[in-house]
Amino acid sequence: MSLMDPLANALNHVSNCESVGKNVAYLKPASKLIGRVLNVMQDQGYIGNFEYIEDGKAGVYKVDLIGQINKCGAVKPRFAVKNHDFEKFEKRYLPAKGFGLLIVSTPKGLMTHDEARSAGVGGRLISYIY
């Protein structure tokens, strides 16, 4: 059986581990995109430290959970969003205005929707978290 979307699988695993009260989640296979999404989540205070562990295959991310995540997931399909259209997707994926964040892939790298809006850039929606 092949893995169709490693990012969606990783975020679903984090959400499930968080909901049952685990302190650590192991995400495999590891990828650069998953690492960058974890970096944004760490910068925003949703997860603790995370580290990459080489296992001879695709690698594993060990993520320390701190109990801040209610729900997280990947956005499929990855919608293209202009910098003034974020509010429409906030209403669709987030429970309330100003609560949670959308992670966006922009020409300037991965960032939250608030950072993208203030930088004046659009991009593709990658995931949501609250």
From Swiss-Prot:
Q: Does the keyword Ribonucleoprotein apply?
A: yes
Name the Gene Ontology molecular function terms of this record. Answer: rRNA binding; structural constituent of ribosome
Q: Name one GO biological process term.
A: translation
Q: Which UniProt keywords apply?
A: Ribonucleoprotein, Ribosomal protein, RNA-binding, rRNA-binding
| SUPFAM superfamilies linked to this entry | Ribosomal protein S8 (SSF56047)
Kindly list the GO CC terms recorded for this protein: ribonucleoprotein complex; ribosome
Which domain of life does the protein's organism represent? Archaea
Q: Which NCBIfam families match?
A: PRK04034.1
The text of the family note is:
Belongs to the universal ribosomal protein uS8 family.
Task of the protein: One of the primary rRNA binding proteins, it binds directly to 16S rRNA central domain where it helps coordinate assembly of the platform of the 30S subunit.
- How does the record describe its quaternary structure? Part of the 30S ribosomal subunit.
Q: What is this protein called?
A: Small ribosomal subunit protein uS8
Which lineage ranks, top first, belong to the organism behind this chain?
Archaea, Methanobacteriati, Methanobacteriota, Methanomada group, Methanococci
In the UniProt record, the gene name given for this protein reads: rps8
